[in-house]
UniProtKB/Swiss-Prot annotation:
Tissue specificity annotation: Detected in peritoneal macrophages (at protein level). Strongly expressed in kidney cortex, where it may be produced by proximal tubule cells. In liver, expressed at high levels in Kupffer cells. Expressed by dendritic cells. Detected at low levels in alveolar macrophages.
EC number(s) given by UniProt: 3.1.1.77
GO biological process: fatty acid metabolic process; lipopolysaccharide catabolic process; lipopolysaccharide metabolic process; negative regulation of inflammatory response
UniProt binding sites for Ca(2+) 1: 183, 185, 187, 189, 204, 207
Taxonomic superkingdom: Eukaryota
Species of origin: Mus musculus
Cofactor(s) the protein requires to work: Ca(2+)
Propeptide boundaries: 23-33
Region forming the signal peptide: 1-22
Cofactor, free-text remark: Binds 3 Ca(2+) ions per subunit. The calcium ions probably have a structural role.
Phenotypic consequence of residue 262 to A: Loss of catalytic activity
Protein name: Acyloxyacyl hydrolase
Gene name linked to the record: Aoah
Length: 574
């Protein structure tokens, strides 16, 4: 759930493919060792994919590298950059793989992986039959005989390449500010999908007028223009009544806002990006969009998703159901979520929330920092976890901010933290996508490799140490109890406050009743995040709980929905 900007500054493709794995917040990083860890991880992932492509297609390593580059889109110079890497490093990679060396040995020889004074030798694959040092020395001898070692051995930064500098700057700006990069009128809504555009918050319908944006109350009943971008405007010629007044007045419109981490934003790396037997041109069609959304897919998330699910299940996002309940809520969604977000650092980007107390509709706010307060990459992980006292102070600061920005009549729902022991229990003896071809990399090995590189996103739960996993769950329960206490004892002028458990065990039980297995609810590449199915099942449980216990939170069901569809169709889409 933690993926900082630095991840875009190592060796291109690998980071495109392994961005999820280098998942610790930048504010906590030990500098060079973290950067070296990213470079190592990216190199091992990329060399593994090249090696497996050669094996699957019974081709040479050279052909495998060219095949991989041919799969990539031209957008964002991805294909160009791939061929640049092949030209720079390809000859040496060929020589090393031709010597039957595994990807981790190759990357140590190429010095993408480094062993420091306190950094152990990290390996993903089973150790070679010969001693590790002997294998590494053999690899170095191969490179000494190479005539192509013309590239620098340190300070690699793909963003220094002239044709990638602007792309990197755009992504960096998007991540740091958490507001749309393309937003002419600076109203925090955009007509562009990615780079924090309408994949994250309702699409603007007039990007040259900052008084026009989703979620606002209509201006003069939107007689002349659609000021709130819900697709309802103008006057009914039959009776002279404005459509907004006829269809929406008294229907209690409201928006949905998520304050979340990468789980809420639906962080997702398609496994076919790493699985040689499944790779094709079609596998990477969404790569440019995913990269400019920080490898998140909020348009498919459980809270703010507006596209139909790709998973095939019937459950819908909370926004989707809120819009179905009242079509006047069209486009009123915001995903104020960020990779690495926690109660500690939400204050750094909560200003990106777009809500005006004087001119906007109320909102339902879901506070869902479900992991990073107990998850970190530190070797001594427990002291780095948020304490109940810190959680109380952090959340109260957030709620105070919301009280000064949300319109009266809003609602805030605090999500508890899950018990993440299911991660290890469900995955540790299964094969990671990189290990499925040759049955040589389990999730236990993968987690250990990340931990060695100081990149494990959750040393507490993604650990073979059962005692540590238990301690992490105990702290998560303490923090959930703190949230529950806040919800039951604190009051605010502009919103009421509720608490819901993030009961992942109930989601697992639900899924098993449908014939599924727990591991099918976890993102396969990072082995950490809930996947699309899990997010939608959780959204369904939250919706049902609200509907049963606090139905006023959802507002009325609009009796004019069918008439809105008849007059305005899909209301301009999303």
């Amino acid at each position: 759930m933690k993926f900082p900007w630095k991840v875009f500054k190592t060796t291109l493709l690998l980071l495109l493919l392994s961005h999820s794995l280098a998942s610790v917040p930048s504010e906590d990083q030990p500098g060079d060792s973290y950067s070296h860890g990213q470079s190592c991880l990216g190199c091992v992932v990329l060399v593994s994919v090249i090696e497996q492509l050669a094996e699957v297609h019974n081709s040479s390593v050279q052909v495998a590298m060219e095949r991989l580059c041919s799969y990539l889109p031209e957008k964002l110079f991805l294909k160009t950059a791939c061929y640049f890497l092949v030209q720079t490093f390809g000859s040496d990679i060929i020589k090393l793989l031709d010597e039957a060396m595994k990807a981790d040995v190759v990357c140590y020889a190429l010095e993408f992986c480094k062993r420091g004074a306190v950094q152990p030798q990290c390996h993903l694959y089973p150790l070679p039959q010969e001693a590790w040092e002997s294998a590494l020395e053999k690899a170095r001898q191969v490179l000494r005989r190479s005539s192509t070692m013309k590239y620098p051995r340190s300070g690699r930064n793909i963003c220094s390449l002239p044709f990638l500098t602007k792309i990197c700057q755009k992504i960096e700006l998007s991540i740091k500010k958490a507001v749309p990069f393309k937003d002419i009128d600076s109203d925090k809504h955009s007509v562009f999908p990615t780079l924090r555009g309408y994949h994250w918050r309702g699409r603007d319908c007039n990007d040259s007028d900052k008084t026009v944006y989703p979620g606002r109350r209509p201006d003069n009943w939107d007689i002349h223009q659609d000021s709130n971008c819900n697709g309802i405007w103008g006057i009914d010629p039959k009776d002279g009544i404005p459509y907004e007044k006829k269809f929406c007045e008294g229907s209690q419109p409201r928006g949905i806002i998520l304050l979340g981490d990468s789980a809420g934003a639906h962080f997702h790396i398609p496994p076919e990006w790493l699985t040689a037997s499944q790779m094709s041109v079609n596998s990477f069609l969404n790569l440019p969009s995913a990269l400019t959304d920080e490898l998140n897919w909020p348009q498919l998330s459980g809270v703010t998703g507006f596209l139909d699910s790709t998973s095939g299940i019937e459950e819908k996002s909370i926004y989707h159901r809120l819009r179905k309940r009242n079509h006047c809520n069209h486009r009123d969604y915001q995903s104020i979520s960020k990779n690495g977000a926690s109660s500690r650092n939400l204050k750094n980007f909560i200003e990106s929330l777009s809500r005006n107390q004087a001119s906007d509709h109320p909102a339902i706010v879901l506070y869902a920092m479900i992991g990073n307060d107990v998850c970190n990459s530190k070797a001594d992980t427990v002291p780095e976890m948020t304490t109940p006292e810190q959680m109380y102070a952090n959340v109260m600061q957030t709620l105070t901010h919301l009280n000064s920005h949300l319109p009266n009549g809003s609602h805030v729902i605090l999500y508890g933290l899950p018990d993440g022991t299911f991660l290890w229990d469900s995955l540790h003896n299964r094969y990671h996508p990189l290990g499925q071809l040759n049955k040589d990399v389990t999730y236990a090995q993968f987690f250990s490799f990340l931990r060695c590189l100081q990149l494990n996103p959750c040393n507490g739960w993604m650990s073979s140490n059962k005692t540590l996993r238990t301690l992490t769950s105990e702290r998560a329960e303490q923090l959930s109890n703190t949230l529950k206490k806040i919800a039951t004892t604190e009051t605010f002028a502009n919103f009421d406050l509720f608490y819901v458990d993030f009961a992942f065990h109930e989601i697992i039980e639900d899924w098993q009743k449908r014939g599924g297995q727990p591991w099918q609810l976890i993102e396969p590449v990072d082995g950490f995040h809930p996947n699309e199915v899990a997010s939608l099942l959780q959204a369904n449980r939250v919706w049902e709980k609200i509907q049963l216990q606090w139905p006023h939170v959802l507002g009325k069901e609009n009796p004019f929905n069918s008439q809105i569809e008849e007059v305005f169709g899909d209301q301009g889409g999303h």
